[in-house]
Amino acid sequence: MQLVDRLASHDEYQRLRALVEGVTLVQVIHVLDESSIDEAVELAPFVDRLLLDSGNPRLAVKELGGTGRTHDWALSARIRAATDRPLLLAGGLRVDNVGEAITTVRPFGIDVCSGVRTDGALDSDKLARFAHAVFAAA
């Protein structure tokens, strides 16, 4: 289960696990600044994976992903080094930058959406080129 926002308290993570037996919890961390590292370290013990994405939950209307923008991959690499959870990388990944993103962060996996679409629809040519770029970098 992907959690695009924080739960109200640490206890809520355990409560969710009790309510949904066998659930895998993936906490999205919106990589904004140094505080994102602290947030990831704080929440990692309560979840199974972390997904690092662009967005800004601090805005009046929260921006919780799907922006098509990259974030600072150096911060993502620091989060990877500071936590023991498998890390998924998202946020503005495209054919022309996914290799650098993988080399910099060394994530467990990646999440892509807008970077493989044309006019809002998945584009098989972009998907194929993206996959080749991923395999070349891995």
What are these regions (language model features)?
Residues 8-114, 118-120, 124-138:
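Short loop-to-alpha-helix "cap/lid" segments that border enzyme active sites
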